[in-house]
Amino acid sequence: SNDEDIESFLIGLNEKGVSETEVTAAAIVMKEKSLRFDIGDGSHIDTCGTGGTGLHTFNCSTASSFVAAAGGAKITKHGNKAISSKSGSADFLTQSGANINHEREKLISIFDKVGFVFLFAPLHHEAMKFVMPVRQKIAEKTIFNLLGPHTNPVSYTHLTLPTT
């Protein structure tokens, strides 16, 4: 598809309203197409938020992942750059000096050492490169905001969904 088709589809879906069935189906397909891998014993938490609150708040999902990790929780934080909000998890971390572009082996090593790892969505969902420019152009919440918390490339036992 070309960018205009993707843009029309995403805007039309927003105007219609995204159904639970559409989110579920899209999440299943995204997970099937993602570059999945195992990390740790599988007993960990993702704090991926939906972003795009329009409230211009700080990145709650990343902040909450640090709080949980400080309390001893094992975190596999899935996230992206800001599309429809002020600061995405990737923005928060890179502005803090973190390298978010690691290969799987390095991610596993980091997780094994510190119990926390950030999974930069575009590295694990290769098809996203086709929709990212359109999402940036639209600059508002789309179905992809809802998919983030459900498409972590590693299996996790718990998901916390931060809210503002």
Language-model features, listed with the residues they occupy:
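Structural signal for hydrophobic packing residues in well-ordered secondary-structure cores
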Residues: 13-18, 27-38, 68, 72, ...
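Conserved small/polar residues in nucleotide/adenosyl-binding loops
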Residues: 157-163
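Conserved active-site and cofactor/substrate-binding residues in soluble primary-metabolism enzymes
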Residues: 1-8, 18-25, 59, 63, ...
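Acidic, glycine/proline-rich low-complexity segments that act as flexible tails and inter-domain linkers
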Residues: 1-56
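Acidic, glycine-rich active-site loops and adjacent beta-strand->loop/helix elements
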Residues: 49-54, 79-85, 124
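A glycine-rich phosphate/pyrophosphate-binding beta-strand-loop-alpha-helix module
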Residues: 10, 58-114
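Phosphate/pyrophosphate-binding betaalpha-module
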Residues: 95-153
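Structural motif
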Residues: 43-46, 73-76, 91, 99, ...
